[in-house]
Amino acid sequence: MNLNATILGQTISFVLFVWFCMKYVWYPFISIIEKRQKEISDNLVSATHAKTESERVNAEALLCLRQARVKAQEIIKQANKCKMQIINEAKHEAEKEQSRILSQAREQIIYERKRVTDELRKQISELVIEGTEKVIEHSINEMIDIDLLNNIINTLSYKD
């Protein structure tokens, strides 16, 4: 009986131990495990959402990058067009300035030519008057007249 009482005591203590574990240890462990499983599943769902959100944001970033490239190309194209327009305007202005300078130079040349021509005419007329005066003064001697005329001709030819 001693053996039966021991087995009975051990059975009772085991049942009490199981009951105690079920009441105070098992359910808190199970609730902690379930809570952690719920957190893990929530974190997995959150990670999945974050991954899809990341893919969406990445796609939006790529789209924005493409749009920025297109816009940059348009800006470059407009800048090149503006550059060409500025170059053409500068070329046109340079041509106008060139023609203005050339016309001023031509006018200056014409003016100088006219001034020099008038001055030469004046000098020639003075020389003719001077020569005529000398011829008249020396008209007595015919030979002197010929020498004077030759001198005048030589003088005129040296001044040209």
From Swiss-Prot:
Its job: F(1)F(0) ATP synthase produces ATP from ADP in the presence of a proton or sodium gradient. F-type ATPases consist of two structural domains, F(1) containing the extramembraneous catalytic core and F(0) containing the membrane proton channel, linked together by a central stalk and a peripheral stalk. During catalysis, ATP synthesis in the catalytic domain of F(1) is coupled via a rotary mechanism of the central stalk subunits to proton translocation. Component of the F(0) channel, it forms part of the peripheral stalk, linking F(1) to F(0).
This protein's UniProt keywords: ATP synthesis, Cell inner membrane, Cell membrane, CF(0), Hydrogen ion transport, Ion transport, Membrane, Transmembrane, Transmembrane helix, Transport
Transmembrane segments: 12-32
Cellular compartments annotated: Cell inner membrane
Primary location class: membrane
Name of encoding gene: atpF
KW Transferase (keyword) present: no
Classification via InterPro entries: ATP_synth_B-like_membr_sf, ATP_synth_b/b'su_bac/chlpt, ATP_synth_F0_bsu_bac, ATP_synthase_B_chain
Matching SUPFAM superfamilies: F1F0 ATP synthase subunit B, membrane domain (SSF81573)
Assembly notes: F-type ATPases have 2 components, F(1) - the catalytic core - and F(0) - the membrane proton channel. F(1) has five subunits: alpha(3), beta(3), gamma(1), delta(1), epsilon(1). F(0) has three main subunits: a(1), b(2) and c(10-14). The alpha and beta chains form an alternating ring which encloses part of the gamma chain. F(1) is attached to F(0) by a central stalk formed by the gamma and epsilon chains, while a peripheral stalk is formed by the delta and b chains.
Protein family: Belongs to the ATPase B chain family.
HAMAP family: ATP_synth_b_bprime
Membrane protein topology class: Single-pass membrane protein
Domain of life: Bacteria
Protein name (record): ATP synthase subunit b
A Gene Ontology term for the protein's cellular component: proton-transporting ATP synthase complex
Keyword Electron transport: no
GO MF annotations in UniProt: proton-transporting ATP synthase activity, rotational mechanism; proton-transporting ATPase activity, rotational mechanism
